[in-house]
Every structure is written in C-alpha cells, then in structure tokens.
Amino acid sequence: MKNTQRQLSSSFMKFLEEKNRDLEAVFAYMDANRDGRISAEELKKSFKTLGEQMSDEEAEAAVKLSDIDGDGMLDINEFALLIKGNDEFTEEEKKRKIMEAFRMYIADGEDCITPGSLKMMLMKLGESRTTDDCKVMIQAFDLNADGVLSFDEFALMMR
C-alpha cells in the first residue's frame, strides 16, 4: 500500500505543487463522470493516461487509503490527502522523469505537445479524446497561448 501511495505521489504530486487550482484541474480531469468523486476505476484509467499501470487491487487500496467518509470514492479533499505522500526523488530525477513523460507525448520530429500528438498518445493508452478535448487540456497549461505545450510548460504542469 505504501508503494501504491508513493507511486501515486510521484506521478501526481508534481502536478499539484504549484497551486490549488492545479489540484482542482487534475481532480476534474480524473472525475470522468463529473460526479464530484473519483472511483477506483477512474483513478486507474487516469493513471493509465499518464503512462502508468495500476491494478484493480492497487486502485482500490489507493482509494481506501484516503477515503475518510467510507463511501468508496474520493472527494477533492480526500484526493488531496492521497497524493500528499513523500516525494523521494531528487530534482535531477524529477527532471529526467518529466522529460521521459514529455517525450511520450510528442510526435516524431516535433519539440512540443500538440493536440494531435496528445490525442494519439491517449489513444495508445486506451483513452478516447477528441482533438477539441486535447486542445482544452493543453490550453489549461499553455502559458504563451501558442496552442501547444513546450517542455517548460509541461514541466510546470507536472511539478
């Protein structure tokens, strides 16, 4: 269970360190059915979107870890508790992992994440998203409003 929390922490904590709005954005993205709660299945699918594998048992354990009210789901406060585990990576390791993730989402010959490359990667991961969905996802972190994510923008999003 500690390994599951560490895995969740390393993948999602980078997303959430900047501001509370990042937490809300990640939560909203993971809450696929928009009911204000994240189920173990939604957690597992979102994890897969980030290029990580999570078993049904790990997803259930992760939800139970922070499910304060015992409803089998995570509200935004419980989700915040889940991801606040110890982040044991050095800055160099964090940057390397972020670069590895970034490379997964860029098309050959490109140096940025485009709506098309994001859509393609999500399809490979079993997530069906429209190009418009991908544009919205990119827009949330596109600091210079050029319609794509540079490595620096991606790194800020992941921290």
Swiss-Prot record:
Residues that hold Ca(2+) 1 according to the record: 31, 33, 35, 37, 42
Coiled-coil residue spans: none
Residue intervals of the EF-hand domain: 18-53, 54-89, 93-128, 129-159
GO molecular function: calcium ion binding
A Pfam family assignment: EF-hand_7
Cellular component, GO annotation: cytoplasm
InterPro entries documented for this protein: Centrin_CML-like (IPR050145), EF-hand-dom_pair (IPR011992), EF_Hand_1_Ca_BS (IPR018247), EF_hand_dom (IPR002048)
Binding positions (Ca(2+) 3): 142, 144, 146, 153
Keyword Calcium: yes
Function: Potential calcium sensor that binds calcium in vitro.
Official protein name in the record: Calcium-binding protein CML39
Species assigned in the record: Arabidopsis thaliana
Gene for this chain: CML39
